[in-house]
Amino acid sequence: RAVIEINGGCNYTCSMCPQTDPVTGKTGARGKNWLKKMPLDMFEDIVAECTEAGLNVVNLEGSGEPSLNRNLAEYIAIVKKYGAKAFCFSNGMRMKDDFMREVVDAGVDFYRFSIIGYTEELYKKWMNSPFFNLALSNMKAMNEYVAKSGSDATIASYHLVLDNDNIEYEVEQYKKIVEDAGVSTEIWKMHNWAGVYKPEYEREGKIKTCGRPFSPDLVIRAGGLDGKTGAVHPCCQVLGRDDEAVLGHFQDNTLSEIVSGDLYSQLREQHRTGNYPDFCKSCDFLIDDPETLVYTNHKRDLYKMHGTNFDLNDYR
């Protein structure tokens, strides 16, 4: 799987996301050098190179909002050209009308709406947006168009538990949204973004490698250091610590050079020994807590990456 971020920016300022500056409340806290749009030709070059290594799935969001790219359908078409599945994780605010239909018609395989909060008030609190009902109607309309057009796409929602002492109630509230729209879903406990965000609860369990440095999973950013593009990160959870976690740049190096290079090799050794780098050691993905995926109504395993055949448990 390749997570290729086609836009490093976001049009939301969610309170739990490192994209949001905790002082100003504005987006872009990861730094201007990470808020780029990936050029279409570079995107195709990366997809083509990853295809030679056995690419199955491309996620087009990374840690940004893919629908900010008005030509999103062109990126999806490139993924399909190379025989891979095209996945998008999004807030869904822009996914409507002709834009939505273009995305579906281009062949998107999986489109997930992030909806944090099950009422307008909670959505406004956590996602800092008044577009709760718009997101719901967009999701429902997209699912209806998928059925009408004969597309094989899966439309899904993603939710976070807001109060760990009230999980059963919150799951039931989220399920009302899901059942009304007729979509797939998954509900998770919050995580801490490699220690950047501190949720009100702490996960409990044995600490061991998350498995990502050893898995066939690659995270490529739209931006990079020193004005470069195509930076490679260990995973999306280093959002907010972007500068620290760079393992190479597709602008400068080939896929083989990056994954076999000194920085990636060092990261794997740190995960073997438990001497984790600063951008990993506070991450709650290192904690073996099987209760983080609270509910799902489709085939989504805790450690199985969407659309792939590998399981992170095999690398832990």
Where are these regions (language model features)?
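Short, well-ordered alpha-helical microsegments
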Residues: 69, 95-97, 120, 167-168, ...
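Short, basic/aromatic recognition patches
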Residues: 198-214
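Conserved alpha-helical substructure of the radical SAM core
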Residues: 1-110, 121, 125-126, 133, ...
